């Protein structure tokens, strides 16, 4: 089992953890419906970049 040779200082510990922070997911607003969705994903209504790409249950 690996054991550290020297104790890591609080500064080095903080530097190691600097990339662990959580970030908000990148959201986009669909121009036709105004709904928010993940970037590069289809909105819940089936729109992508202003065009209808799939049929949903609510469609006639």
Curated annotation (Swiss-Prot):
Q: Which parts of the sequence are annotated with region: Disordered?
A: 1-60
**InterPro entries per record:** Ribosomal_bL32 (IPR002677), Ribosomal_bL32_bact (IPR044957), Ribosomal_zn-bd (IPR011332)
Presence of the UniProt keyword Disulfide bond in the record:
no
Kindly indicate where the leader peptide sits in this chain: none
Stretches with biased composition (Basic residues): 49-60
Q: Give the matching Pfam families.
A: Ribosomal_L32p (PF01783)
- A GO molecular function for this record? structural constituent of ribosome
> According to its record, what are the GO cellular component terms?
large ribosomal subunit
Q: Which domain of life is it from?
A: Bacteria
Q: Does the keyword Ribonucleoprotein apply?
A: yes
Q: Which UniProt keywords apply?
A: Ribonucleoprotein, Ribosomal protein
* One BP annotation, GO: translation
PANTHER family this protein is in? 50S RIBOSOMAL PROTEIN L32, LARGE RIBOSOMAL SUBUNIT PROTEIN BL32
What does the similarity note say? Belongs to the bacterial ribosomal protein bL32 family.
Query: Under which name does UniProt file this protein?
Result: Large ribosomal subunit protein bL32
Which organism is the protein's source?
Nitrosomonas eutropha (strain DSM 101675 / C91 / Nm57)
